[in-house]
């Protein structure tokens, strides 16, 4: 892991050195970089990305053309290969077809508040995510409350447990969850665990997947880091989802690492919120998990050996 990070930093530093060297000694490099910067700024401005995301890049590129262009090309673009994008979109669309909108629910909302109805109608018609009734929501103002509630519901699992997180840490908070997952897997419950490689890079050892699979837990990694730097490395999975039997779901801002539950304090007191959903709306959480899970092939993952 450390070697990978050092290798990437060396590549970035070397590219920056070369660009600055030519920029200083060759006037035409300055003119070319300015021209490219203008084209790039126009391209960024014309995208559908939120303005809050576009403006910082535009400012950096115009203020420091050479370095700005380099940094944007390395970290500013969300680059996904056509094959990966096609595979994910195909899987997501197939799952969305199973999520039908009850028009009576939209009518009820429209009769009560046209402003809220317009938002719900957009989500349902344009994004394919239905609006639900028959769902209880419990809000947790701190991650510690969410973790305790999550552990209680995991103990009740009878059919399946799906978990997808940006960061998982092998420490006391996740150890409690892992204990439940291992026991449930041994009892015949289907357990799937999915995490982002970069988010967990300093938290998990290289044998984590082996351990999970040895205990009957189907474990996958999103976009594992390769030694050679590539643009796709910047695409990360920041979801925090737990689904239990398709009836109960959890989401929120906390990952499964001790710092999120104030067991450790590397950045001071941490506050993140969480939600527990019980009822029909859990269907969408299930679809979101499965669409990402099934978009990752075995060939996309690091090998056990």
Show which residues each predicted segment covers:
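N-terminal localization/anchoring segments of enzymes in phospholipid and broader phosphate metabolism
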Residues: 1-305
